[in-house]
Each structure stands twice: as structure tokens, then as C-alpha cells.
């Protein structure tokens, strides 16, 4: 299925059913009192985070969603049925914004599986005419109309939730690495931008199968990515939720005069996009050591040691050095990103004073 991480949709909650204007009519009781029932409430629209979903593709196919209306009230004090709620399943990590005129407002971040959020409240059902009987009004010929359901225009943005993000220049071997560390099977080829969408893989501890870690293979970043060049900043946002980064550099991209230029280019793009990303712990990895001559590999390791950098030298193709990298990844498992907690503002209920009243005339 095609990976889609941003869509705009509209949602309309159900309208409340109208209250009924009715009077008791039985044998020997030609002029009974009012007995109109209440209308049913309209259905709500609810968003639910679903860990089985990885894309917003379905919401690009269908752009408008409407919940069921409430039934109107009936005579003999019979109330209308409530409209059925519409529950829309979204990938974990989806952020919802409401669009009002030319502005946009944050509503909710579905950052945990199973989280539900009432995005649009159904209209309340109108009260039947039996509610308006009084000592001075014995035959009320009016009832409340059902309230309109809330309607909203929304932008949905998916930011992948992963423990670690695998980043680097194009063709650094990131896809091969994630396939070696997990059961993911991304498209792999020897040319830049093979990965056009983020790939997810789950890394499982051989000694403890319940110990798992989610990896995200982020498409290759080039100089100017923060300004939209290459695959652009559309994928940089997927790094924001990771706890730490695995920064991969191909041995073929190492220059003797400036061996770590590849690391610097990517880090500069991260800094330009969001300077807080530079606080994220990075595991520096040099990949494709199998294609190097032993003398050159030895020289690069000496340069790394003299620079004070801790760098893991691996070959994702042959598996050389993978075991040491895996140990380092598990040591960072408990690392937590100190993200600010966002308090959600609940949807407020309206007072009865805001309810409309419909006047309905009936014949005696």
C-alpha cells in the first residue's frame, strides 16, 4: 500500500433528531395532554490510534466522513434512537490539526495505541412538546429542533513512532542494515534514493523475545534537505519522535582530507530543520568495510581513534561488526526523549440556552 503521511479531510457529526409535537388521543380522552418524545442525539466521530496501520492512504481515497443522524421523537413519549458513532482508525503517531479560515490549530496527538479522541460531537436531540407543558400552557404546539452536529476541516499528519532512526546520505546501506537488524524487507539497490518512504523494522532480543525495539529507515538525506532538496524535509519530521539515531556513512564516501564530512552534512541538515535533534544520542556507523583494502580500513580506524569519535565499523552485507553494533543499540534501549507533555483540551458541551426552538402548529 502506498505510504501517505499527510492528508486533509472534513468530518460531520450526526444531527440530533427533532423533538415531536404530539398529543394524547384515546377513546373518551379527545383532548389529552402533550406526549411528544425527544429526538435522539446525533452520532459522534471518534479517532482511534491503531498500531496495525502505517499509512494515511485510506484518507486520501475518501476525504469526507459523516456520522449517523439521531432519529426524531415520536408520539406516546417515544424517544428517537441515538445516531451510531463513527470510529475512524488512524496510525499511531498521527497529529490532528483543525483548519479555521487561514489558521490552523493543534487538536490532539495520537501517540499511543488505543488512544481515542472525540473529534466531532453529535448534535443533541430536541425535546418533545411534553417538556413545555405548564399551568399556563396546557397544549404546547412546539418542540425543540435537533442540534446540528459539529463539522470540522482537519489536516492529519503522520510522524512515525520508532525507538531509533537510521539516517545517512543516500546509498549508505541503511536499508541493508535494517534488513540485517530486523525482519524488514525494504527495496535494496546500489543507487541513491532506493528508499522513497520510511521503512519500519522490529529488532528482537535473541535472549528475551519480549524485548523489542522499533527501527525506522529514513530515506537518504542530502545537503539542502531542510529546504526541500532531494526527498526534502517531508521525511525529516519522522526523525523527531525517535529516542536515538543510528547514523550510517558509507566507506565509499570517506575522503582522506575530511573523512567525516558525510556525518557533518547530515547533522547540519538536522540542525537546520530542528536544532533540538542535535541533542539526540547518535551511534556513528561506517558501513561497507568489506569493499575497502585492509590498509585503508586500518588507516580510517586510526583516524577515528585519534579524533575521539566512537565509530562502529560494519558490513551490513556480510554481517561483519553487526554483533557489536547490536550490543550498543540495546544499551541505549532505555533512553527516553524528554518531549514536552501537551495537555489536551476536551470538547466543551453547550448550554441549553444555545438550543433552537422550532414552533410547530398542529390542528385540534
UniProtKB/Swiss-Prot annotation:
<feature type="domain" description="OBG-type G">
    <location>
        <begin position="162"/>
        <end position="334"/>
    </location>
</feature>
<dbReference type="InterPro" id="IPR045086">
    <property type="entry name" value="OBG_GTPase"/>
</dbReference>
<feature type="binding site">
    <location>
        <position position="175"/>
    </location>
    <ligand>
        <name>Mg(2+)</name>
    </ligand>
</feature>
<dbReference type="GO" id="GO:0000287">
    <property type="term" value="F:magnesium ion binding"/>
</dbReference>
<dbReference type="InterPro" id="IPR006073">
    <property type="entry name" value="GTP-bd"/>
</dbReference>
<protein>
    <recommendedName>
        <fullName>GTPase Obg</fullName>
        <ecNumber>3.6.5.-</ecNumber>
    </recommendedName>
</protein>
<dbReference type="InterPro" id="IPR027417">
    <property type="entry name" value="P-loop_NTPase"/>
</dbReference>
<feature type="binding site">
    <location>
        <begin position="217"/>
        <end position="220"/>
    </location>
    <ligand>
        <name>GTP</name>
    </ligand>
</feature>
<dbReference type="InterPro" id="IPR014100">
    <property type="entry name" value="GTP-bd_Obg/CgtA"/>
</dbReference>
<dbReference type="InterPro" id="IPR031167">
    <property type="entry name" value="G_OBG"/>
</dbReference>
<comment type="similarity">
    <text>Belongs to the TRAFAC class OBG-HflX-like GTPase superfamily. OBG GTPase family.</text>
</comment>
<keyword id="KW-0963">Cytoplasm</keyword>
<comment type="subunit">
    <text>Monomer.</text>
</comment>
<dbReference type="Pfam" id="PF01018">
    <property type="entry name" value="GTP1_OBG"/>
</dbReference>
<feature type="binding site">
    <location>
        <begin position="168"/>
        <end position="175"/>
    </location>
    <ligand>
        <name>GTP</name>
    </ligand>
</feature>
<keyword id="KW-0378">Hydrolase</keyword>
<dbReference type="InterPro" id="IPR005225">
    <property type="entry name" value="Small_GTP-bd"/>
</dbReference>
<dbReference type="GO" id="GO:0003924">
    <property type="term" value="F:GTPase activity"/>
</dbReference>
<dbReference type="GO" id="GO:0042254">
    <property type="term" value="P:ribosome biogenesis"/>
</dbReference>
<dbReference type="Pfam" id="PF01926">
    <property type="entry name" value="MMR_HSR1"/>
</dbReference>
<keyword id="KW-0479">Metal-binding</keyword>
<comment type="function">
    <text>An essential GTPase which binds GTP, GDP and possibly (p)ppGpp with moderate affinity, with high nucleotide exchange rates and a fairly low GTP hydrolysis rate. Plays a role in control of the cell cycle, stress response, ribosome biogenesis and in those bacteria that undergo differentiation, in morphogenesis control.</text>
</comment>
<feature type="binding site">
    <location>
        <position position="195"/>
    </location>
    <ligand>
        <name>Mg(2+)</name>
    </ligand>
</feature>
<dbReference type="GO" id="GO:0005737">
    <property type="term" value="C:cytoplasm"/>
</dbReference>
<keyword id="KW-0342">GTP-binding</keyword>
<feature type="binding site">
    <location>
        <begin position="315"/>
        <end position="317"/>
    </location>
    <ligand>
        <name>GTP</name>
    </ligand>
</feature>
<feature type="binding site">
    <location>
        <begin position="193"/>
        <end position="197"/>
    </location>
    <ligand>
        <name>GTP</name>
    </ligand>
</feature>
<dbReference type="InterPro" id="IPR006169">
    <property type="entry name" value="GTP1_OBG_dom"/>
</dbReference>
<feature type="binding site">
    <location>
        <begin position="287"/>
        <end position="290"/>
    </location>
    <ligand>
        <name>GTP</name>
    </ligand>
</feature>
<feature type="domain" description="Obg">
    <location>
        <begin position="1"/>
        <end position="161"/>
    </location>
</feature>
<dbReference type="InterPro" id="IPR006074">
    <property type="entry name" value="GTP1-OBG_CS"/>
</dbReference>
<dbReference type="GO" id="GO:0005525">
    <property type="term" value="F:GTP binding"/>
</dbReference>
<dbReference type="InterPro" id="IPR036726">
    <property type="entry name" value="GTP1_OBG_dom_sf"/>
</dbReference>
<keyword id="KW-0460">Magnesium</keyword>
<keyword id="KW-0547">Nucleotide-binding</keyword>
